[in-house]
């Protein structure tokens, strides 16, 4: 029974790889969407055809991008290519982190438990609240003067 489950996991992983041996994952955060491609390599990470260190000058965003690879110990064994659009740098970093986690789950199905317990496969559903009429922003009212 365990052998059947193991072969099923292997065939599912084999089906999800493209002809070049790469796997894809899509991540979203706020208004950002990231398409992440993971393949065997030396640890290079490119975001929109630029090194991720140049693309994300803020260390917090770089750490968010690397978080999945560091957790799985795959920082030096895979290359990551990302196309990301929309939103700001923090939203894009979050979208990349989710897309990378989904791609790594396809790359090796044994990683799923670790990714799920660390919360990397959970979509952060928080979105910007819309501005309401009769107010200055989503919640803040206009300045009030008694006299």
Where do the PLM segments sit?
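Structured, basic alpha/beta domains of bacterial-type, RNA-associated proteins
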Residues: 2-4, 10-28, 34-85, 90-147
